[in-house]
Amino acid sequence: MILFHYSVDSYTDSPSLTNDCAGHYKYAEPFLLALERGRQVFDAVFYSAMYASRDLVDLGLRKNENYRKDAVEGIFEYVRRTEFAGVPVSRLHCVYYCASLEEARKYAYDDALADGGFTKEQVKLLTVETPEERAYAYDQQFYNAAKEEIDKNNVDAVFALARKYFALERTESPLIEILSDGENRVLKVETY
């Protein structure tokens, strides 16, 4: 299956992409482990992470408070493991793809280039081959809504949105992301 990926400041001319190349699992793992112990433990970890993250931002060691995104990823992974055991691809151990090059260009622009945070030299557009049986299409709108809910500390809503995401439901205006944890091969570095 031919898919398209944009890589922000991490692609190194390798013949393949690493699942979880950004190492996001290690940040979501404390929230996942806490959920395995119970909701009260999760809440304690969440509020502790809030405090520590704010300290790191104040000290200039982090640009922003990422703990909320990490908590959402932890909740999504917990829901996948406990309620959707048949879903083999984890958001934390995969590569994210787009179905078309144009879509990948748009995502790259919206996520990395529009605000001037990165240059076109730092954001690589790639054509990649990956096994079709390891690729799953989800509506990212549920994930985006979950990030908004966690900003309001509405953890229950995040669980509900994770369930819709993994049940393959679609919003009225779906924003499709394709996750794959299969072996892959970079076929071409595209130009803008």
Spans of features found by a protein language model:
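Conserved NAD+-utilizing ADP-ribose enzyme module
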Residues: 2, 9-66, 91-93, 102-115, ...
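An acidic/histidine-cluster motif and surrounding catalytic segment
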Residues: 61-86, 92
